[in-house]
Amino acid sequence: MGNITAKLVKDLRDKTGAGMMDCKKALNETEGNLDKALEWLRKKGIASAEKKSGRVAAEGSIGSYIHTGSRVGVLLELNCETDFVARGDIFQSLLKDVSMQVAACPNVEYVSIDEIPEEVVEKEKQIEMGRDDLSGKPEQIKEKIVEGRIAKRLNELVLLSQPYIKDSSLTVEDLVKQAAAKIGENIKVRRFTRYTLGEGIEKNQIDFAEEVASMQTN
């Protein structure tokens, strides 16, 4: 792996408008080769998508997905910049794919890491700090282990961090950025709601043997 310097990361950011972490990843994947890293970002749809990410996305569409058997349903709001793009095939296909992703991810609660409340982060930290396998470890080492575990746990709660169900080499965030690059507009997943049939309803549990016995006495 090549020497990934801060200057190299800055140069790639200046050329592409991509985020720092995306640039670092691209350079690591291409052993520090700037031209190859630029191409890597373009293939991922990140290079041009990042430049659009600051623009207002107030149009869009609300999509729905009902899973086979009608036991899971999803409503999802996907935003873009113009109504024309919202009606297009690329946008509508993305809306369907992301809605399907939510249906397949019952543990996902938030769109992005930024949406996770501080109290949730703190609760996860307390849980991890109290685990038996950390007892006796120096505080500094314990903090690093907990930090890694929390990051992993929080990503499990976030839609954009999920591996895309149709291509696990991509995340949902990658998928959105690729669509934004193709369309030439900013695209944002605004919010979603996932419904599961019977969720929250307390069901009566009947013992099968008791049920048969009661039928025989009638």
UniProtKB/Swiss-Prot annotation:
It is found in: Cytoplasm. InterPro entries: EF-Ts_dimer_sf (IPR036402), Transl_elong_EFTs/EF1B (IPR001816), Transl_elong_EFTs/EF1B_dimer (IPR014039), Transl_elong_Ts_CS (IPR018101), UBA-like_sf (IPR009060). Its main location: cytoplasm. Keywords: Cytoplasm, Elongation factor, Protein biosynthesis. CDD domains: UBA_EF-Ts. Associates with the EF-Tu.GDP complex and induces the exchange of GDP to GTP. It remains bound to the aminoacyl-tRNA.EF-Tu.GTP complex up to the GTP hydrolysis stage on the ribosome. This is Elongation factor Ts. It comes from Prochlorococcus marinus (strain MIT 9301).
